[in-house]
Design a protein with these regions (language model features):
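Short hydrophobic/aromatic patch on the recognition helix
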Residues: 36-47
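Basic, helix-initiating cap at the start of DNA-binding domains
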Residues: 1-22, 26-31, 35, 52
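Hydrophobic alpha-helical connector segments
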Residues: 56, 70-97, 147-151, 170-174
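Amphipathic alpha-helical packing segments from all-alpha helical-bundle domains
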Residues: 94-103, 110-138, 149, 174
């Protein structure tokens, strides 16, 4: 790895940590530079402004999520759908740092058009991938899109609220399976 790549990686690591620990308002180019032990001009060489830095952090997390989803082969049975739902709900519980980053981006998107557009494109991609995964189980395009929207929306919301629910995730997964199955087979 080159010195430039090392420096860029360090900037992203420090910026990600600041975003997790201090949120959007605590993430400044100057704090990143100080925490990384490099000059502000070096940080600005790689990222001209905070939006560029936020997008680079998002690229790391969102690309990982999309890559993982794209590895999922199209489902051939509702048993496979149940396993997918269960794994997604469990994953939402296990990846607290990632969820913290997502929640921060959701908040930022309410006041930052660039990040809002970035999230729109990300969820559009996730929706398309989930449609591809569910397609073999669907009776038509309308039910496919409705089911994908239900699944994506629920899993994303569950990543925020799931740990506070007094119901086991397996029970939630079974209930969600029935809702998605009902939507897919209408």
């Amino acid at each position: 790895m080159t010195k430039q790549n090392d420096k860029n990686k360090k900037i992203l690591q420090v910026a990600t940590q600041l975003l997790k620990s201090e949120g959007d308002m605590g993430l400044t180019m100057r704090k990143v530079a100080t925490s990384a032990g490099i000059s502000l001009s070096n940080v600005q060489y790689y990222y001209t402004n905070k939006n560029a830095l936020l997008q680079a952090i998002a690229d790391q997390y969102f690309d990982d999520c999309v890559t993982q989803l794209k590895q999922q082969t199209p489902l051939e049975s509702f048993e496979q759908l149940h396993m997918l739902i269960t794994s997604q709900l469990n994953y939402a519980h296990e990846v607290s740092d990632m969820c913290r980053i997502f929640r921060e981006y959701w908040a930022i998107s309410t006041r930052n058009d660039d990040i809002n557009e970035y999230l729109r494109r990300y969820y559009e991609t996730v929706f398309t991938v989930i449609c591809d995964v569910l397609r073999p189980l669907s009776s038509d395009d309308y039910t496919l899109k409705t089911s994908a929207a239900l699944l994506v929306s629920f899993v994303e919301g569950y990543s925020v609220t799931g740990k506070f629910m007094p119901v086991e995730s397996e029970r939630i997964a079974s209930t969600l399976l029935e809702a998605v199955r009902g939507s897919l087979t209408k």
